Amino acid sequence: MNTANAPAEGSVHEWKCELDKANGKWSYYDNGTAWITYTDNFWKSHLGQVVQWVGEILNKEDDMPGTSGEKCSFTECQCKVDGAGYVDAGFSAADAKSDDGSEWGCERVSGTAFNIWDKNPNT
């Protein structure tokens, strides 16, 4: 992942996070390429219990991806169940929330999609 250069406007990406239980290794992928891994023996006998899809910024002053007119869309969201394949996220309206509703918007589109945006871009 090229953290120095944000993705181009309108670009499409696939991000994935997976646990290899046999090795206790989490791998984070950007468009199919592992860009960071984390290994700890703890994960050989434990599973992740919570899945979160987050539109995140580094500093509070940074702009969140998207604007009210051009929202940033997370689509086809799924999670992998231990010993099985991927299943749809199953988002409810209550799942779409913002830490600061005066700054950042979030709306549920479907059970597998939501939009985020900065309510005050460039400020």
Question: Where on the chain are the PLM-derived regions?
Answer:
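Exposed, interaction-prone regions of secreted/extracellular proteins
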Residues: M1-T123
